[in-house]
């Protein structure tokens, strides 16, 4: 039986590790990065009156937007302040009104 040369074995290991890293990058890191960017843009586009859902499942209407917090009106007399990161989506069926550009 022939034995592989040490250089060939080392080259195979390097190629294998690079392939593992590339798979890890394209299957885990890149999709998470895209999702973070999408969520950041979503948070920047929020305005008063938008109907949203929090990560804990609370539905409400945006009444105030701070630097790091958002206050939602969840009932007639109930307002709750959340961290911006807790807002995850618009309510189903809610259509955001686009500002008209003249």
Curated annotation (Swiss-Prot):
Topology term for the membrane: Single-pass membrane protein
Question: Pfam families in the record, alphabetically?
Answer: YajC
Where primarily located?
membrane
For this record, an example GO cellular component is: plasma membrane
> What's a BP term from Gene Ontology annotated to this protein?
protein transport
InterPro entries the record matches = Preprotein_translocase_YajC
Q: Cite the entry's keywords alphabetically.
A: Cell inner membrane, Cell membrane, Membrane, Protein transport, Translocation, Transmembrane, Transmembrane helix, Transport
Q: What SMART domains does the entry give?
A: YajC (SM01323)
Please list every transmembrane segment annotated in the UniProt record, as residue ranges. Answer: 9-29
Q: Where in the cell is it found?
A: Cell inner membrane
The reply to whether Cell membrane figures as a keyword in the UniProt entry is yes
Which domain of life does the UniProt lineage start with? Bacteria
Q: How does this chain assemble?
A: Part of the SecDF-YidC-YajC translocase complex. The SecDF-YidC-YajC translocase forms a supercomplex with SecYEG, called the holo-translocon (HTL).
Family membership noted in the UniProt record: Belongs to the YajC family.
Q: State its role.
A: The SecYEG-SecDF-YajC-YidC holo-translocon (HTL) protein secretase/insertase is a supercomplex required for protein secretion, insertion of proteins into membranes, and assembly of membrane protein complexes. While the SecYEG complex is essential for assembly of a number of proteins and complexes, the SecDF-YajC-YidC subcomplex facilitates these functions.
Task: Name it.
Answer: Sec translocon accessory complex subunit YajC
């Amino acid at each position: 039986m022939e034995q592989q040369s040490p250089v060939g074995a080392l080259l195979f290991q390097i190629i294998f590790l690079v392939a593992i890293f590339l798979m890890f990058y394209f299957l885990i890191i890149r999709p998470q990065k895209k999702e973070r960017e999408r969520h950041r843009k979503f948070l920047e586009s929020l305005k008063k009156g938008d109907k949203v859902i929090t990560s804990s499942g609370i539905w409400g209407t945006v009444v105030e937007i701070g630097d790091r917090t958002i206050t939602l009106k969840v009932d007639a007399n109930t307002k709750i302040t959340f961290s911006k990161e807790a807002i995850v989506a618009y309510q189903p069926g809610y259509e955001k009104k686009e500002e008209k550009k003249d």
